[in-house]
Amino acid sequence: MTGRRTALIAVAVTVLACVLAWAFLARMYAIPSSSMEPGLQAGDRVVATLLTPDPFPVRRGDVVVFEDTKGWLPGGGHVIKRAVGLPGDTVSWTPGEQTLRVNGVPVDEPYLAPGETPAQEAFEVTVPAGRLWVLGDHRSASADSRAHRAGPGGGFVALDDVVGRARFVVWPLDRIGGAGADPDAFAAVPDAPAPEERT
């Protein structure tokens, strides 16, 4: 009887530990639209690891979940996009070019929806301190940083609003897998220059 009781206690402690880990380290989010296709599709459920107490900073190419504090969505809530520009980065696109440029370096984005160009209109932005520049992978169907340049925050997302990084698709079952983070696409991009180095 003692062995059985010990086993039940061990199972209960394990279940409790999993519930607590879920509550404090991860959350599930639903993908509401096609803006992150083809990697994430409308109706997918993704698990995001929370940034607090995550010791690792957001990287270029990470798929991030952030709280909508700037009115991007009619009812507020959470938004999921790809982090393309980190604080200090200059992100640009010129019509006719096949790639975005980050800090002057062309970035091949293999996660883009088929047939997509990196953007529909020319832009060049330098990301302020404590902010991110985010884009959807289905660029022509994504109201991302580009669409909100004239709004509060200038289209930039505050790092303080980022709640986590999408890690896994967990539903539907036939789509279980990674959530599409691709920091390797940005491997050749140099760090942003220090403010005094900019001209």
Regions found by a protein language model. Name each.
Residues 6-24:
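Hydrophobic membrane-insertion alpha-helices, especially the h-region
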Residues 1-2:
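N-terminal Lys/Arg-rich, disordered targeting/topogenic segments
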Residues 33:
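A short acidic/basic microdomain associated with nuclease active sites
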Residues 8, 24-30, 38-199:
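Soluble "head" domains of membrane/secretory-pathway proteins
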